[in-house]
Amino acid sequence: MGCTLSAEERAAMERSKAIEKNLKEDGMQAAKDIKLLLLGAGESGKSTIVKQMKIIHEGGFTSEDNKQYKPVVYSNTIQSLVAIIRAMGTLSIPFGDNERESDAKMVLDVIARMEDTEPFSEELLAAMKRLWVDSGVQECLGRANEYQLNDSAKYFLDDLDRLGAKDYMPTEQDILRTRVKTTGIVEVHFSFKNLNFKLFDVGGQRSERKKWIHCFEDVTAIIFCVAMSEYDQVLHEDETTNRMQESLKLFDSICNNKWFTETSIILFLNKKDLFEEKIKKSPLTICFPEYTGKQMYQEASAYIQAQFEAKNKSSAKEIYCHQTCATDTNNIQFVFDAVTDVIIANNLRGCGLY
């Protein structure tokens, strides 16, 4: 009889070895394919993170991209000024100079004619500049938490001469500061540290959330964005719910969701630059009445972080937290590098390769 293997048995062994090899290769390939889901409430900075990935990993914006963002910059700028003018009516703040009424009418007429994406005429630019330095407008800007105003309002309105120039072309920073509501799902692909990333940005407003569900399969990690600066603001959608309380509720539902028991969760406490300015004058007790700490960045941001981390009900799950400024490319590059290292370690462990 002997111990030689029959041709059939040899073929079966070869097949088995090949399957094992393929499984290992598949495992290594799976470890290289990274699916990231960007979640968070509306205006938490998700789309800005996507733009940063384009800058950091895809060579930035083309001149064609720059051109396409021009009307967005014009619209964001004039719409921000209009939001302030309308809020002055609601908050009963008069113009410092009555002559600004006619300037305000000119700006409102541009919106009414739906010409907000056009370059500013000389006349319009002069009116906007006069309005921007008006004491009433500046007073209303200081109360921006009482109405809905783009974070980038001051950034753009402080630079009207540059934006109004005939040869104006958006800079990288201008593009990062633009705001367009995300509807549907935006997908970005890039490679980094020998990994293939697919990043999905889904709309944060309540009406957009039902579109998330089919993105949930095979997610390697979730990046959950929170705007730290929104602790004293209410939602666009209902004007009564505190934005940070809404974020906490949403984080709770994501963090403890059955879909995500095996998924790494990375928390970006974003807009730290705005938070640092705001915390000096607007108390954290607006959102957290039980807070007794100082109105200082370190203590207040640590408290916010602790509130989010406390939502995690699983002792086996670690939340990886970073304080970020999504408009700062160096900061996001540094943070994303750290995030990738965590993903690599967790992923290899999950594939039994670490």
UniProtKB/Swiss-Prot annotation:
What are the record keywords, sorted? GTP-binding, Lipoprotein, Magnesium, Metal-binding, Myristate, Nucleotide-binding, Palmitate, Transducer
Segments carrying the region annotation (G2 motif) are 174-182
Sequence segments annotated as region (G4 motif): 266-273
User: Where is the stretch described as G3 motif?
Assistant: 197-206
In terms of Pfam families, this protein maps to: G-alpha (PF00503)
Q: Which Gene3D superfamilies match?
A: GI Alpha 1, domain 2-like (1.10.400.10), P-loop containing nucleotide triphosphate hydrolases (3.40.50.300)
| GO CC annotations on file | cytoplasm; heterotrimeric G-protein complex
Q: Which residues are in the G-alpha domain?
A: 32-354
Region annotated G1 motif, chain positions: 35-48
Residues bound to Mg(2+): 47, 182
Any one GO molecular-function label of the UniProt entry: G-protein beta/gamma-subunit complex binding
Q: Sorted alphabetically, which InterPro entries does this protein's record hold?
A: Gprotein_alpha_I, Gprotein_alpha_su, GproteinA_insert, P-loop_NTPase
- Sites binding GTP sit at 40-47, 176-182, 201-205, 270-273, 326
Q: Where is the lipid attached (S-palmitoyl cysteine)?
A: 3
- Region labeled G5 motif — which residues? 324-329
Spell out the disulfide connections. none
Which sites carry lipid of kind N-myristoyl glycine? Answer: 2
Please list the GO biological process terms of this entry: adenylate cyclase-modulating G protein-coupled receptor signaling pathway
Can you tell me which family this protein belongs to? Belongs to the G-alpha family. G(i/o/t/z) subfamily.
Record function comment = Guanine nucleotide-binding proteins (G proteins) are involved as modulators or transducers in various transmembrane signaling systems. The G(o) protein function is not clear.
Quaternary structure annotation from Swiss-Prot or TrEMBL: G proteins are composed of 3 units; alpha, beta and gamma. The alpha chain contains the guanine nucleotide binding site.
> What protein name does the entry list?
Guanine nucleotide-binding protein G(o) subunit alpha
Q: Which organism is it from?
A: Lymnaea stagnalis (Great pond snail)
